[in-house]
Amino acid sequence: MTYFVLFLGLCFVLGGLAVASNPSPYYGVVGLVLASVAGCGWLLSLGVSFVSLVLFMVYLGGMLVVFVYSVSLAADPFPEAWGDWGVVGYGVGFVVVLVAGLIVGGSIGSLDFGVVTVDSVGMFSVRLDFGGVAMFYSCGVGMLLVAGWGLLLTLFVVLELVRGLSRGAIRAV
């Protein structure tokens, strides 16, 4: 279980690195999805399964909407890939800065690889915290409705902003 949590942490850092050095929106969304899956898996291993599920749904839903709009606004005929030298240079530079920060901060020698999960037994150590669902919908229903209306308004604003001169954003092919 410790190695699994460390692997999720490594995937989270690599996903953030992929987002930071993304050459185009086509490839940046891969890093976002990797980072969100790894982060939610990390939360799941620590025992907060409901929060992990909600964050996973919000992150993936929001990221897919942002991905669609950024691809529609920045459609490049020849997008750069991760194998190009400029992108590899950014990635190597970010890793060098990360390692230098760890060395300067003195954290490189004191890294403790002991990860404690909820029960510290087995791979499926998920606490039953689904009592938060009832609290979320009973006490937070007002904010949930306000957030839903805000997201709907944002959707219509973005659709209005990206439409062409004579055609809307949703075109018939």
Swiss-Prot record:
Pfam families: Oxidored_q3
EC number, as in UniProt: 7.1.1.2
Cited Gene3D superfamilies: NADH-ubiquinone/plastoquinone oxidoreductase chain 6, subunit NuoJ
Topology with respect to the bilayer: Multi-pass membrane protein
MF annotations from Gene Ontology: NADH dehydrogenase (ubiquinone) activity
Reaction(s) catalysed (UniProt annotation): a ubiquinone + NADH + 5 H(+)(in) = a ubiquinol + NAD(+) + 4 H(+)(out)
Keyword annotations from UniProtKB, A to Z: Electron transport, Membrane, Mitochondrion, NAD, Respiratory chain, Translocase, Transmembrane, Transmembrane helix, Transport, Ubiquinone
Membrane-spanning segments: 1-21, 27-47, 48-68, 85-105, 106-126, 139-159
GO CC terms: mitochondrial membrane
EC main group: translocase
UniProt KW Mitochondrion keyword: yes
Annotated localization: Mitochondrion membrane
Major location (coarse): mitochondrion
Similarity-based family: Belongs to the complex I subunit 6 family.
Free-text function comment from the UniProt entry: Core subunit of the mitochondrial membrane respiratory chain NADH dehydrogenase (Complex I) that is believed to belong to the minimal assembly required for catalysis. Complex I functions in the transfer of electrons from NADH to the respiratory chain. The immediate electron acceptor for the enzyme is believed to be ubiquinone.
Protein's UniProt name: NADH-ubiquinone oxidoreductase chain 6
Organism: Aethia psittacula
Gene name of the encoded protein: MT-ND6
